[in-house]
Amino acid sequence: MKNISTPSAVPARGPADHEVRDQIVAAATEHFSRYGYEKTTVSDLAKAIGFSKAYIYKFFESKQAIGEMICINCLREIESEVRAAVAETDLPPEKLRRIFKVFTDASLRLFFRDRKLYDIAASAATENWQAVQAYEARVQQLLQEILQEGRQSGDFERKTPLDETAMAIYLVLRPYLNPLLLQYNRDTTDVAPAQLSSLVLRSLSP
């Protein structure tokens, strides 16, 4: 899992014209940021962009399909930032600390810098869109990779099953990944990453 991939099942129909699809997504992002995701219909979007509703349906089968693409772009931005931070160190314990810190900071910044776009993130989390499922699976895989490195280096214990350990850490991290949960934890984001990662690292000591 070295590359960040776009989930193949995100609905996209019609001509493989990436420029037009990108144009629709960019215009939709701007429109949603002004008027909100829930209040916007495909007809509203078509009128704002200057395309016909039927033309948009050649590329996306629903409003959710457009929302998923916007969601993918946002999650890719967060994930890229985290992976860059993790790649800067060879020490597994430090990688875990950065996982907690950067995921929290990047999610907070991206999800709440635009309250209208937050609607998309909230819908994605509430309805468990495939883009979110794929993102969560990649986060768990990244945790497993770091845990495996730590076990090989002797930094982490080896008795607990790897997948069980990764899931437990993911559940600790999840309130700072999921926008629905993060909105209720914003007052702890200054201290939580350091405190939680320290607690996790103590539990991983061999």
Identify what each model region corresponds to.
Residues 1-9, 98, 105, 109, ...:
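C-terminal peripheral helix-coil segments that are non-catalytic and often amphipathic
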Residues 1-35, 40-51, 65-68:
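Basic, helix-initiating cap at the start of DNA-binding domains
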Residues 32, 41-42, 53, 63, ...:
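Amphipathic alpha-helical segments enriched in hydrophobic/aromatic and basic residues
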Residues 38, 156-157:
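Conserved hydrophobic residue
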Residues 49-60:
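Short hydrophobic/aromatic patch on the recognition helix
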Residues 69, 73, 83-111, 162, ...:
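Hydrophobic alpha-helical connector segments
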Residues 76-79, 126-153, 163-167:
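Amphipathic alpha-helical packing segments from all-alpha helical-bundle domains
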Residues 102-144:
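Short secondary-structure transition hinges
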